[in-house]
Amino acid sequence: MDVLPAKPLLDNFIFLTNKIDSNNIEWFKSNPKDYTQWFNSINNKYPQAQRINEFNNLLLAKESVEELPDLFYRTSLQRVIQILKYHRDSFYFSIRKENKKVISAIITTLCTKVAEKTNFTSLNTVDLLKYITSELCIYAQLLSKDNLDQRYADKIVIKKTNCKWEIINPVNSEDNLADSWNEDEEKPKLFFKWIEEIRKEFATENEKEYFTNLSNTFGMENLNEDIKKYLGTPEQVTPMKPWRN
């Protein structure tokens, strides 16, 4: 668990410390409460969120203390974020670049912003994972230029202006989550290399291959049936795959 010194500012904003080097720190403005509210406003559109709320209400009505497995408390969006974080750790460890791995705030923000732009809230975990990673792969064009092709003009979750990367915190316009990308040009290159790798791994309609890849990601030899049930299985549903040409 990371613990940072903090002090209140205004409304839901607080000041957190940012280590510049071994001898210097600076205060920067953060807004974790509003960020959580922003995330929930999008996450709650997914069907699993409604099931969780209904079950919680049922437990309260019965005054039950029975707990559900952690896996139940996940929408498909939350599970995609979880899978990406696990896979990120494995990927950067395998290439011995752990000090350059993409931060969790970027993963959560990008996934949620992409999910916000789609009407496909009924997608199960595997299809939402493929949708999000395919969308993010488009932004790899920005490695060599400042603007995406005209056909992608509506895609703005990652920007590049005057050779500077921008992933803006949705509740704090002063917070560019991609600041470190502008200090180390290898970071965005590794990010898109990782995104392409995970996209390829899960770009399959074969259920056995999908669960094999998922098992490898989580370091488990086998996934039990409950996990498979909540993750969902890959399906060939062309209308639900808007990222395909």
What is each model feature region?
Residues 137-245:
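Terminal (often C-terminal) interaction modules
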Residues 70-81, 101, 122, 126, ...:
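Generic detection of long, well-ordered alpha-helical segments
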Residues 6-8, 14-15, 67-71, 106:
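Sequence-structural signature of the catalytic-core scaffold of metal-dependent phosphohydrolases
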Residues 1-38:
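Conserved catalytic core of two-metal-ion nucleotidyltransferases
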Residues 60-61, 107-110, 173:
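Short acidic (Asp/Glu) and glycine-rich catalytic loops that position anionic groups and cofactors
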Residues 74, 84-144:
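Hydrophobic, mid-to-C-terminal alpha-helical segments
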Residues 27, 32-78, 82-83:
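Long, charge-rich alpha-helical interaction segments
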